[in-house]
Amino acid sequence: MNKRIFTACMAVACILPVFKAEAQSDYFFRSKKKKPATEAPAQKSKFDQTVTGAKKSEGPFTVYFTKKNEILFAMPDSAFRREYLLSSRVAATSNTREAVAGQMSTSPFLIKFSRDSINVYLHTPQVGAMVREDDPIVPSFKKNFFDPVLKAFPIVDTKDGKVLIDVTKFFREDEKSITPLTILPPTMQNANVIKGMLDPTASIVTEVKSFPRNVEIKSMLTYKTQPYSEPYTLIMQRSILLLPEKPMRMRLQDNRVGIFNSSRQYFSTDKDKVESFKLIHRWDLQPKDSAAYMRGELVEPVKPIVFYVDSVFPDKWRATIKQAIEDWRMAFEAAGFKNAIIAKDYPTKEENPDFDPDDIRFSCFKYATTTTANAMGPSFVDPRSGEIICADVIWYHNVLSLVHNWRFVQTGAVDPRVRKAVFDDEVMRESLRYVAAHEIGHTIGLMHNMGASYSFTIENLRDPQFTQKYGTTPSIMDYARNNFVAQPGDLERGVRLTPPIIGVYDIHAINWAYRLVPGAKTAEEEKPTLNAWIAEKKDDPMFTFGAQQFPYTIDPTDQTEDLSNDHFRAGDMSISNLKIIAKNMDKWLLEKEARYDDLRDMHGQLMSQYYRHVSHIMPYIGGVEHFEIRQGEENTLSRRFITKDKQRKAMNWLLNQARTYRQWLAEPAFLNKVEQNSGMTDLLGKAMVAALFNPGSIGRIYEAEQSGQPGVYKLTDYANELIDAIFNVKGNLTDADRSIQNLAIDLMSAYSGLSTESKNTARRLSEELDALSHKLSEDNLPCALGCGDHHAAEDGADSFFRLTAFSKQAPNEVIAPLLLQQLKRVQTIYRNRKATGNAADRSFYDYQLLRLERLMKTN
């Protein structure tokens, strides 16, 4: 017991000093009390430090937008296994000279990403060359077609399997691959191209949005333009779109059907050469019910084509635009698809908060408030397959003046409804519907078909029943406008004056491009069926595709702005109508107290329409008709030279017009009233004469003679008949005769090499005629889609056209002696006539004889 008490007391004694010490310490050192030790906070990673405070959004990868307007991508491993489309679009601009709001500044292109421990690399994959995955040459192919690196982005940090990179500069600076400025080679000049240097102090990334399939980045870029350092500011929207893991099955192109396409090369050990082929551009339409589709039933597509119509369109035109979009349903129905294309209004924020007309996911019909009289319909593709990913129609405000002028000069003599400065809405809707449908045709893959209208006869175009069914052309993708062949009284008989809603060729082309081929598993397996569809229509000229020609028209059967297969009669009938308009338009367009500016402009439209008809006859001189033939077919000619009879007819037609057009188109009293410069009307006559001596045309006449084809002109016969037609004029000379003969002597002196002075005259004339052609062709709705311009070269996009720049020239040893001989013939004609005619004629003959004698002596 005592032992237990002792032990307890000792335990207390041992404890008390401890508590006391603590108490003393607390008492004496209370002012210096230390806080209990805590664990030091963990230092933030560089990843977290960089993105702190940034707005985060999730898309194909994570995107951060910092308070300093920086953009950062956090990319998981999965992002490096996919491919994307990168686009650059003008969302707003301070100057519409080069591009308008809503327009792509560059063609979207394929990209992918790779990484190492230092950088993330932005590649532009090679798409122009292909190889089969199991071909033994694949290792060599990959080494020789390595995907180039467009940009490298240093890795900021890595976290949770994601690498962080800063891409701000790429979207804030003047990155050449997505620049809004057009980059031209030093040898090329274009007055519409804006040149300038980026002003980094006035350029910034303004907004970033992410969605499951895409990232949208807006930047404000400001340039100081040259040479005056004026500011040029744009809001650019760049899209990065995640592409399907498995590309759409491609379809092979055929020149007998006009579909936009991309060129490719195929490397294989199974072939003795590198094969070239083209894949067409089309939307990926797949039936909701494949079994029903294959039974021939109309089936809705899984994903229809949807166009959103700009909310700023005037209400009176909006329904017409939507109607024109959905007019193409009849073509898709021929391919087995119901409701394949849909027109919708721009949705409100309540209806679709994610809608953005500049987002690459949305295809839109956009309104551009500019003075340009045009419209265009580009589409943008996945270059791996040709699948159209998105498309736009850019509708320029002043397109109304374009269609107004067409209707007035082409049908004003026949249709009283168009004899006014402002059309009734009903009439304007007819024309707007055609233009809108034409542009939508481009967005679904169709190229211009310039040969379509050649399949109709004059009689067809004046037949009420025929025109009500077929309009003016089998394809609205032709530049065949209104029925200028129709004569007064034809409208009352029921003749249609406008193009069809959709042409029969257009329906055929959509069927060929979009109808699924039963049983085919590859593009190669589709070919027999596709060829059979073409063969079914081979003997019907309505289904012939006529390729556009560039830069010159040498095939008279594939022309722009023409109607019928008889350009001579069509021209005569339209010119007869133009004379009626010229005689009456000052009364029809009378606006009391107004200036004559509008009337002068409309006279310019008359000249443009007249020049179109002249231009339709010029290609017959030395002309060539082209055919798309295949081995094994009966017709083995890919080209046929225009016959002597047609060329002679063209020669006489042009000379007759050159002698007579001033009598009605350049009536002095009218020109003086409206202050119209007669210099341009004078150039019309010179253009006709120059066409008869054109070296390219002369060269093709010579080539035809060498070809052995029957019925062609011999060059000497052409020259003899031309000189007779120009210089052997009965009776007194008119002013037009003297002008024609003087120019003919100039041109022969120049092209024979006998006169340096005449060479200079011919060169100046060529420049003047180029300017005239450009001026009078401004209202031809270029669409920005002709001759390979549909897409930029980055994705290999193309359109089938005939290159006509390198026509064979007649050798100098042939042409020079021939022209010298003809000049001597002219001398003889003048000597025989110098004592005849009136005083003006005799003076003219004396002058020309003196001129020719000096020319001969000098040489």
Where are these regions (language model features)?
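Bacterial Sec-dependent N-terminal signal peptides
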Residues: 1-26
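Auxiliary tRNA-acceptor-end handling modules of aminoacyl-tRNA synthetases
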Residues: 24-313, 331, 335, 346-403, ...
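Solvent-exposed, polar/charged alpha-helical surfaces in well-ordered, non-transmembrane soluble domains
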Residues: 45, 319-326, 330, 434, ...
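Zn2+-dependent metallopeptidase catalytic core
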Residues: 80-81, 316-340
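Sec-exported extracytoplasmic/periplasmic mature domains
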Residues: 326-337, 441-442, 446, 482, ...
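Extended catalytic-interface subdomain
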Residues: 376, 381, 387-395, 433-444, ...
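Conserved catalytic/binding loops enriched for acidic/polar residues
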Residues: 453-859
